[in-house]
């Protein structure tokens, strides 16, 4: 572990410096990492720039995920695109369809003669971004999955010593937390489509969409209005009456409800771990997602969120050599260990995970391995390997609108999810027609 800490400190020190040789070939990466995550990005980029003198990577923050993807598309049309762009997972099908715009990572590595072993990467992470024959299209960067964060002090006050394992227990534990005065509400959530519908589906091994959630064809259709989905969403809506569940908003907007001690549990991205450590004044645990025991005997696997690095065409051969070297650097065991241990994201390589696991890190940081275990403890099924759906950025907006209508009592779960399926399928057909 001392060796790991020593080399991680080297990565940090290198990131404090900037600039390489004046004649270095310039390469550019547009990303969506702000705040502390942006600082970690700059540390890694600084380390790469100081590790060699041939290339200089310039990292440019372009706003949130949607803004970054939109900016890259506009830049490509204007022939002013960066070499690399960070795109969130829901943009995967859209990027794959843009065959004239993307330079597949596996092909770039081969063309530039850069050694590249895909078996190094955690299968549950890279599977989302590969072709049907296992070729990597983009390099996973900030990968996460939804988990349960729980307030240990509140649980102790309520006479509870562990997180709920099932949704049945979520209701029971929440009511006990409220009645004991330990918290105002039981739980809140974030990224609601991702956590309460997409991962809910894979965790229960039920289809979110036909055609293996889009992996097997563009003629996929949504089916997240099944009886199990309706039951789940309606239960959440009903739980609002007793403060068992409280909606705090999209993305991470509900996090303050947990950080301020109002809600005793938070279901959101594992990537928020670092931020919660800074914003909470109590010890909290991290546990796996709950499942409906009335529906399944045990859960399947969750899927990743976050984003991946796509290489865009239009650069020179020498520039792509620099991009390939940068991606090799990004995959370095110590760079990945630094990224994993300093953020809430999972490592993308088996080496970085094993290095961390064999140290005392997980013993000293309880729950930091939950995300990896939750994603990879079982081989994925056709229902749980991920989603590959066109126009999904816009479809996520539809899901947010319909879920918020349900939370507000304007629609039942059956009507709201049915409307979301109908509206979403129209966008799927539009994508299919455009990419036949």
Question: What role is predicted for each listed range?
Answer:
Residues 88-145, 165, 198-202, 228, ...:
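Hinge/lid segment of periplasmic solute-binding proteins
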Residues 74, 82-83, 114-154, 185, ...:
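A structural signal for short loop-to-beta-strand junctions that line the ligand-binding cleft
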Residues 132-141, 146, 171-221, 263:
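Extracytoplasmic/periplasmic solute-binding protein
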Residues 367-423:
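C-terminal capping/gating helix-and-loop segments adjacent to ligand/active sites or protein-protein/ligand interfaces
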Residues 174-176, 217-248:
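Glycine-centered hinge/linker elements that transmit conformational signals in sensory
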Residues 51, 78, 135, 156-158, ...:
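Extracytoplasmic/periplasmic substrate-recognition and gating elements
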